């Protein structure tokens, strides 16, 4: 049986004037229309094709070699292209827009905005469907991340404490406000780092490396910038946090630790309004 809403490697069983028919197992033969047949298939791979399976406008299984923006079981930020009496329709990169039923909204949506959704297969209709109700699709079991581990993040929503983000398509995490030093919005994809996995299972995130490796990296960055600026920079431990963030992308606290370590090592001199190479 073909996996609807996912990529499948399927065997070609029939050539016709309007496309290829692929073996969908219990689902029967699935059409790959001519417009989706690759022109450069190596001869040894002619009998098998990697295709995405979904339902066309007539609710028939169809194959495509086009790449959707998201597969079943994944999260993504998608643009609302239409809102009508049926529901909310999203652009997911395929000719037939993706339906988000009104029952799966968290709030009212309008055309042109972006929304973070999870994509699932409706068990009754076998239709690929989107939902903005994310909690039920995130893993609630204890996470096994380690502090400093690099992860993929999808920023999902703003909160009073910062931004909630989906970690590796599996878990909720939180980027606290004091860890944000650049423009942030829901739907943004970022590389991030595990800061802490708390005893209650909640995960704190950072947009910068953490731990000793991060400190070493920041120290090197400060020294390199000093060398590039004739050994002096108009910044110090008394500078405004905004200036520090714009120059190095870190918090004032982390910056003070870094220049303090460089000072102790005799590598720099700290003045009230600047730092200099020793």
Q: What spans do the regions from the language model cover?
A:
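Single-stranded RNA-binding regions, centering on S1/OB-family and related RNA-binding modules
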Residues: 1-278
